Amino acid sequence: MAFKFENTGERPRTVHHLCEVQETSLLELQLQCVYCKKELSSSEVYNFACKDLRLVYREDSPYAVCNFCLLFYSKVRKIRHYNYSLYGASLVALTKKELFDLLIRCYRCQQPLTPEEKQLHCEYKKRFHRISRTWTGLCLQCWRHTTSTETAV
């Protein structure tokens, strides 16, 4: 069943909140990709929820993003909207916040980085990147799948 949310103030922003409003489970939730319009599989809906990504609305209907489009448009975003890079200590000095208090997402898959992943960036002297007004780095899963030159942006 397709829900419409005409009142912008009442629109659920997360998949979990949408499940509550629609009184359905995460596995039964049906969402389309905002880019390719394909229906997301149950595992893609679950991944979207685990990455704590936000729903977007088109014509008052909620949309998410499929795994293929997420990786593709993350790459496009990295290329088009890269600003600059900083090491962990410089990022702490600039923001006046500890790394653990900053929301830093993986620039490849958009997963929020764990405190351990942020610490690894510091230990291995990998930089964090400012891409489209957001701090990014690499999660462990994507770290394994990328080459060392790719982290230099």
UniProtKB/Swiss-Prot annotation:
Query: Which is an annotated GO molecular function term of this record?
Result: DNA binding
> Does the record bear Nucleotide-binding in its keywords?
no
Q: Which InterPro entries match?
A: E6, E6_sf
- Pfam families in alphabetical order: E6
Q: Where are the zinc fingers (unnamed)?
A: 33-69, 106-142
What are the subcellular locations of this protein?
Host cytoplasm; Host nucleus
Q: Where would you say this protein principally sits, based on its record? A: host cell
UniProt KW keywords: Activator, DNA-binding, Early protein, Host cytoplasm, Host nucleus, Host-virus interaction, Inhibition of host innate immune response by virus, Inhibition of host IRF3 by virus, Inhibition of host RLR pathway by virus, Metal-binding, Modulation of host cell apoptosis by virus, Oncogene, Transcription, Transcription regulation, Viral immunoevasion, Zinc, Zinc-finger
Entry keyword annotation includes Cell inner membrane: no
What are the annotated GO cellular component locations? host cell cytoplasm; host cell nucleus
- Coiled-coil ranges (or none): none
Q: Which GO terms describe its biological process?
A: DNA-templated transcription; regulation of DNA-templated transcription; symbiont-mediated perturbation of host apoptosis; symbiont-mediated perturbation of host ubiquitin-like protein modification; symbiont-mediated suppression of host cytoplasmic pattern recognition receptor signaling pathway via inhibition of IRF3 activity; symbiont-mediated suppression of host type I interferon-mediated signaling pathway
Assembly and partners are described as: Forms homodimers. Interacts with ubiquitin-protein ligase UBE3A/E6-AP and thus forms a complex with human TP53. Interacts with human NFX1 and MAGI3. Interacts with human IRF3; this interaction inhibits the establishment of antiviral state. Interacts with human TYK2; this interaction inhibits JAK-STAT activation by interferon alpha. Interacts with host DLG1; this interaction leads to the proteasomal degradation of DLG1.
* HAMAP family on file: HPV_E6
Further notes on this entry?
Belongs to the high risk human alphapapillomavirus family. The cancer-causing human papillomavirus E6 protein has a unique carboxy terminal PDZ domain containing substrate.
User: What does this protein's UniProt record list under function?
Assistant: Plays a major role in the induction and maintenance of cellular transformation. Acts mainly as an oncoprotein by stimulating the destruction of many host cell key regulatory proteins. E6 associates with host UBE3A/E6-AP ubiquitin-protein ligase, and inactivates tumor suppressors TP53 and TP73 by targeting them to the 26S proteasome for degradation. In turn, DNA damage and chromosomal instabilities increase and lead to cell proliferation and cancer development.
Q: Which family does it belong to?
A: Belongs to the papillomaviridae E6 protein family.
Protein name as annotated: Protein E6
